[in-house]
């Protein structure tokens, strides 16, 4: 995946989580999907592991959702964020705060946002 800044939906999600839990926001999105986004580091790690990266391509696509509220519900209840949210507070009220922040950033009604991933092809050295 690309950095958090290259994923509009998840950047809005993280902003909502930071608003809901300013002292201790869940860090799953920052540390797991977006925590290994530097292709220079990934390629170096591949070389250390005995692979040679023969192609590195960053792909940006546009995601679509019926609403920011639907995105908030899906992320909060249907990802590894859920137990982290429930350990800090109420799932329903947190989802509402996250939805408000996501709507402020993405708009109301149907939403779209960019998302970037890195595709790396590697072969044994």
Model-assigned labels for residue ranges:
Residues 30-125:
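Conserved Class I S-adenosyl-L-methionine
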